[in-house]
Regions:
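Vicinal oxygen chelate
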Residues: 23-42, 44-54, 85-87, 101-180, 211-214, 218, ...
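Bacterial N-terminal signal peptides
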Residues: 8-18
Length: 343
């Protein structure tokens, strides 16, 4: 039944049409030193996001080879098997890969991590608000952590970095110049009923606007997303032969991360060369949020939304496409409402 509800929520929007843009968000690379989101909740910002993968070798080629994120450390279970691998974005933020994805599985996001400046205080606040945080324990990375289950089964972990932890030992290290981005700007968390979940993220977690987490970072809570437009050939949601694949690709677009960049064209050209991608796979367009956007996908379909810091002028309307290829020129402007003009 739960899977059926997930699929229904995804298809309500997807079949009706395309919304090829992210929600508008604030902040940027220059905003990372900002104060916590709200004074009475000691949340500093996003600590990272974990994606499930089916093949670590292929995943490494993407996260390290294409995105340029240095492999920082790994954790192992009691049997000695790799439990997760961390890739470093900056001293405060990591992407974690969990190698347990099975063929045909729908959900890829393993957890979303929030950084706290006072984990014990945060735990007490959430307990007083009627939430059910797990006890604070020491995670495999050496940091204290507790978990809350959010709407639609979202796994939300709250951590506090401490000296001697894996992240603490790597502070100031592995800041690879090959990184396409030095800032995780936002994370998309699948939420079946956005209206019903709003009080949880706003009133219970204490996030301003139900999304802001500090340092200019934020969460999105979509129940559908059609940002699969760089996957060709496009899949027909009404075709029984490809319906399951369509659902998986749609969920991979929903459960996403957004990386901030300062120069979209330079970034697009770089990842195209690294990944040997076609022009279609690195198409960049202006979103409704007025930022240049590009959507990349890991080998298991999890989306990385690449978003330029600058807001574009009105002369470059939403859905305008950056001129493909290495040539420099004006963008391709849309001719029809809600239709990307290229290809």
């Amino acid at each position: 039944m739960a899977r059926k509800n997930v699929i229904i929520a995804l298809l309500i929007f997807l079949v009706a049409g395309q919304t090829l843009t992210a929600q508008r968000g604030g902040g940027g690379q220059g905003a990372q030193a900002a104060a916590p989101a709200t004074p009475d909740v000691p949340i500093v910002g996003l600590a990272g996001v974990a994606f499930r993968v089916s093949d670590l070798t292929k995943a490494r080629a993407y996260y390290q080879g294409v995105l340029g994120l240095a492999e920082a450390f790994s954790t192992k279970d009691q049997s000695g098997r790799v439990g997760s691998v961390y890739f470093k974005i900056n001293d405060e933020q990591y992407v974690e890969l969990v190698p347990d994805m099975k063929p045909g599985e729908l959900r890829r996001q393993a957890r979303v991590m929030f950084q706290s400046s006072d984990l014990k205080k945060l735990h007490a606040i959430y307990t007083e608000r009627g939430l059910a945080p797990t006890p604070i324990t020491t995670g495999p990375d050496g940091n204290p952590v507790f978990r809350l289950l959010g709407p639609s089964g979202a796994k939300l972990d709250f951590i506090e970095y401490v000296p001697g932890s894996q992240q603490g030992q790597l502070r100031g290290k592995l800041l690879d110049s090959r990184r396409i981005s030095t800032h995780l700007w936002h994370v998309g968390i699948y939420t079946e009923d956005r209206a019903a979940s709003a009080p949880f993220y706003g009133e219970k977690l204490g996030l301003p606007r139900g999304r802001d987490v500090g340092r200019g970072e934020y969460i999105e809570t979509p129940n559908s997303d059609s940002n699969t437009e760089t996957k060709y050939p496009k899949l027909d949601p009404n075709n029984p032969a490809t319906r399951a694949q369509f659902e998986r690709e749609s969920m991979g677009a929903v459960e996403h991360m957004a990386l901030e960049v300062t120069d979209m064209k330079a970034t697009r050209d770089l990842v195209q060369d690294r990944g040997k991608y076609t022009d279609l796979w690195v198409r960049a367009h202006v979103g409704n949020n007025r930022h240049w956007l590009m959507h990349l996908f890991d080998p298991d379909g999890s989306r990385a939304e690449i978003m330029e810091t600058a807001i574009q002028p009105d002369s470059i309307p939403s859905l305008s496409v950056m001129l493909p290829g290495k040539a420099v020129g004006p963008p391709i402007l849309p001719k029809e409402p809600r239709v990307i003009p290229w290809p």
